[in-house]
């Protein structure tokens, strides 16, 4: 009986665990679900059987971790990204295949030779973004190359958004569908880098939310695309060393970025220092911390003046709706500006039970072939069922689950530290997502448009 150990049983495993559990008997697998919180592990697994069980674990306890991993065939690590190496080192020592949905770190890359020497697979970036974005992009790019095309332009965007039917009167047309902290801290990791028409381009952190691209995705409407931090790191992986334009980004509804930029300019997304005495502050007083002293003007007036926001601007209506001027108080004694903003936004941006989220992915590829310039737009939209069965959780967990099946069923897979960017990975994973789960892409040829 093949043994699978899942380490970390958070939101992203909501579809992963049922997929594996449904196949335990037919494939003769055993599933062990581990989490630092026993109740979380038990809740995620559901009823224990002779082929599945749950337990608590502290993965910083190397002895306990190795004990749990003994005689395991595949480990799936869904712990915070900075803790993957704890699991990776144990897997390497015990000769266990490892799968994660997280970005491939330099430290993980450094294990490549040792992983190959043991004929192991250490698969990373096999979720949604990163994950399905890589696989769908490489399917497009490989197909064009096989037909003799020379890639000149590649753009890719993904957004975790609200389904239109759940937007209601929410002026942001957005709620948290994933880790709120990551949303609040977005854009703070240094300058954005990409290539446009053969020129390297850079956007400093304070301008990330002012430089957006308008994108119309057929069937899903208009969006604004915000550049991801480093598109260039995928040049080699995508075999795009000579491409003229390479740009990866995030989708939001129009108007989101300008309003969010207000939080950035105020300093509310700063996570580098702590505000003391927050339990004595209202949200309104917190907002006033970032504005000049003027006892005669209201907080709203000072903010509009400081940020040069017109009275009737939809930016102001978004800020009011977000609750930064309310008299609610913080329940904690101290926190960074970013932590305080996250607390405020979670009150209005947490999904209600009936809310549906939506994933939208969009690729644009331009190439030359036989003296002609061609372009294809490829899009995918996928809606969740409700706040417990979200599109985000489904599309993050299922690729990993299918990849686990590929490893355990003896598919011909090359060893090493890798991403799912070869046909041996993206072929069967995308095929199953489309056939069984309706995660489908629609491609359309359009007139070539450069910059």
Cite the ranges covered by each PLM segment.
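Conserved N-terminal Rossmann-fold NAD(P)-binding element of oxidoreductases
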Residues: 4-11
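Hydrophobic/small residue at the entry helix of a nucleotide-binding pocket
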Residues: 12, 16
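Helix N-cap at the beta1-alpha1 junction of Rossmann-like dinucleotide-binding domains, i.e.
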Residues: 36-40, 105
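Rossmann-fold cofactor-recognition segment
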Residues: 48-60
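Conserved Rossmann-fold cofactor-binding substructure of NAD(P)-dependent oxidoreductases
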Residues: 58-70
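ADP-ribose/adenylate-binding Rossmann-like module
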Residues: 90-108
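Rossmann-fold NAD(P)-binding glycine/threonine-rich loop
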Residues: 102-124
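C-terminal catalytic/substrate-binding lobe primarily of soluble NAD(P)-dependent oxidoreductases
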Residues: 143-451
């Amino acid at each position: 009986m093949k043994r699978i150990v899942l380490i970390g049983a958070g939101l992203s495993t909501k579809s992963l665990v049922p997929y594996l559990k449904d196949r335990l008997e037919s494939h003769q697998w055993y599933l062990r679900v581990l989490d630092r919180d026993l109740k979380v592990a038990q809740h995620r697994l559901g009823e224990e059987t002779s082929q599945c069980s749950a337990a608590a674990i502290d993965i910083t306890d190397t002895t306990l971790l190795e004990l749990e991993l003994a005689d395991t065939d595949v480990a799936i690590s869904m712990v915070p990204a900075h803790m993957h190496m704890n699991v990776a080192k144990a897997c390497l020592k015990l000769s266990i295949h490892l799968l994660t949905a997280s970005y491939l770190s330099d430290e993980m890359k450094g294990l490549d030779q040792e992983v190959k020497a043991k004929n192991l697979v250490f698969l990373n970036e096999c979720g949604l973004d990163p994950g399905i974005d890589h696989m769908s992009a490489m399917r497009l790019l490989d197909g064009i190359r096989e037909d003799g095309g020379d890639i000149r332009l590649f753009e890719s965007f993904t957004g975790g958004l609200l389904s239109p039917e759940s937007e209601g009167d929410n002026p942001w047309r957005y709620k948290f569908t994933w880790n709120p902290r990551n949303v609040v801290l977005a854009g703070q990791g240094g300058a954005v880098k990409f290539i446009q028409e053969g020129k390297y381009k850079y956007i400093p952190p304070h301008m990330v939310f002012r430089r957006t691209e308008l994108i119309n995705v057929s069937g899903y409407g208009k969006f604004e695309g915000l550049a991801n931090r480093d598109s260039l790191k995928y040049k080699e992986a995508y075999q795009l060393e000579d491409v003229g334009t390479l740009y990866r980004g995030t989708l939001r509804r129009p108007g989101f970025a300008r309003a969010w930029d207000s939080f950035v300019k105020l300093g509310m997304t700063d996570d580098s220092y702590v505000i003391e005495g927050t339990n004595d502050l209202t949200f309104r007083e917190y907002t006033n911390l970032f504005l000049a002293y003027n006892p005669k003007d209201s907080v709203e007036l000072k903010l509009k003046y400081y940020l040069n926001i017109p009275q009737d601007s939809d930016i102001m209506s978004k800020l009011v709706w977000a609750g930064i001027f309310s008299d609610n108080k913080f329940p904690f004694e101290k926190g960074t500006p970013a932590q305080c903003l996250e607390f405020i936004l979670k009150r209005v941006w947490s999904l209600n039970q009936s809310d549906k989220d939506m994933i939208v992915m969009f690729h644009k590829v331009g190439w030359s072939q036989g003296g002609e310039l061609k372009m294809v737009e490829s899009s995918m939209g996928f809606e969740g069922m409700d706040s417990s069965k979200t599109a985000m959780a489904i599309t993050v967990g299922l690729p990993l689950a299918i990849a686990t099946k590929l490893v355990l069923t003896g598919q011909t897979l090359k060893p090493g530290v890798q991403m799912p960017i070869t046909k041996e990975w993206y072929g069967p994973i995308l095929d199953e997502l489309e056939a069984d789960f309706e995660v489908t892409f629609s491609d359309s040829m359009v007139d070539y448009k450069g910059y």
